[in-house]
Structure formats: C-alpha cells, structure tokens
Design a protein with these regions (language model features):
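Structured mid-to-C-terminal alpha-helical surface segments
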Residues: 1-138
Length: 138
C-alpha cells in the first residue's frame, strides 16, 4: 500500500505526520505543471525537486519508487486542469519551463544554490520526469 504520509518520531512520546518523499516530489511536479492555470511561478519547486533527486538519487531511481511517484502525481493532479501535461513530454511545455525558471536568480537571495545553472536543474528534473513509467498511464 502506498502511503501519502509518514510518521516521524521526534521524541519518545512525540511524532509528526508529514508527506512521504514520493508524495512531496509528486506534489512539486503537480505544482510545476499547474503554473499556467494558476498563473504562478514555481522556481522554488524546481530547486526542491533537484535537491531531493540529488540527495536521494539511489532510492528515487528504483523502478518501484518511480511507479509510486507517478501514481501519486496522477492522484494529486485529479481535477486540477493539467491533464494535457500528464504525459512524458508534459514538463517540456515552453510556458511551463519559462515560468519555472522566471526570476530564478532571485532564489540565490533566499538559499544557497551553489551556483548551479537553473537550466541544468531543469534538465535534471525533466530527465527524472521522462524516466517515470508513463507507459502505465491509461
């Protein structure tokens, strides 16, 4: 059973419920795909996905994990008006890419992005998006 949330133990008698890694990535991709309909730029999500893909590369590269990410993306995208982008090349829509990278340099004022080129970040997250098992989508 794929869980959307996980419990994180903070102390012996305290824990918090938070999104699973797979759910976070699915939500971040949904947010990027939804930029056009919401007219919002999501540069932070590009960085967040890039960071998570870098930190958890081995785990996120597993076929079963990619399937979970795609299933969660499909589920969290229901009724969001982004069906036209829920396919392998959906992330390459020029307007989505433009909005994703809009004012990206201002992100450096908020967090240390280690001078990583935004285009390289977008390429990395696009490649992961391509690698999801889209042939399973009906």
């Amino acid at each position: 059973v794929e869980e959307d949330t996980v419990s994180i133990q903070l102390a012996e008698d305290r824990s918090i419920l938070c999104y699973s890694l797979e759910q976070i990535i699915a939500e971040k991709y949904r947010s990027l795909l939804q930029q056009r309909s919401r007219n919002r730029h999501r540069r932070q999500d590009v960085y967040d996905i890039y960071y998570l893909l870098t930190m958890y590369d081995e785990y996120l590269s597993k076929d079963e994990v990619k399937k979970m990410v795609l299933n969660k993306l499909k589920k969290c995208s229901e009724d969001k008006g982004i069906d036209a982008y829920l396919h392998k090349e959906g992330i390459l829509d020029e307007e989505i890419k433009r909005m994703s990278l809009h004012d990206f340099k201002t992100l450096e004022l908020e967090i240390d992005i280690n001078n990583i080129d935004p285009e390289n970040m977008f390429d990395r997250i696009s490649n992961y998006f391509f690698s999801l098992p889209w042939w399973l989508v009906t």
